[in-house]
Amino acid sequence: WGEQEASILVPGDIVSIKLGDIVPADARIDQSGLTGESLPVTKNPGDEVFSGSTCKTGTLTLNKGIVGMTGDGVNDAPALKTLHGLQAPESTSLNLPNDKELSEIAEQAK
């Protein structure tokens, strides 16, 4: 193994990533920094990982045929694409027995 520039990666390359390393290309790790989860997300063999993810424990080996997109094709922010498609609900109701009374109190407090 030797260190190389991420820019020379092509689909199908084998990459070894150790504790604290940044994933240099989309591949099949911990992506909590990209997705916003408060705890690291455990990845298992065959799971997808994204460029910018960080290896938190153990080691990760991207096997031959696993590196996906590189360069301009890398999906830098999968969470952003997901969020752009979401809309906040008009209102949220917990369907509590006193929901109507709580709504009236909230309206009066405005």
From Swiss-Prot:
Pfam families in the cross-refs: E1-E2_ATPase (PF00122)
Lipid bilayer topology: Multi-pass membrane protein
Keyword Membrane: yes
Any single GO BP term: proton transmembrane transport
Post-translational note: The N-terminus is blocked.
Compositional bias annotation for Basic and acidic residues: 98-110
Residues that hold Mg(2+) according to the record: 72, 76
Superkingdom per UniProt: Eukaryota
Substrates-to-products reaction catalysed: ATP + H2O + H(+)(in) = ADP + phosphate + 2 H(+)(out)
Keywords: ATP-binding, Cell membrane, Hydrogen ion transport, Ion transport, Magnesium, Membrane, Metal-binding, Nucleotide-binding, Translocase, Transmembrane, Transport
InterPro entries, per database record: ATPase_P-typ_transduc_dom_A_sf (IPR008250), HAD_sf (IPR023214)
One MF term in the entry's GO annotations: P-type proton-exporting transporter activity
Enzyme class: translocase
Known function: The plasma membrane ATPase of plants and fungi is a hydrogen ion pump. The proton gradient it generates drives the active transport of nutrients by H(+)-symport. The resulting external acidification and/or internal alkinization may mediate growth responses.
Entry protein name: Plasma membrane ATPase
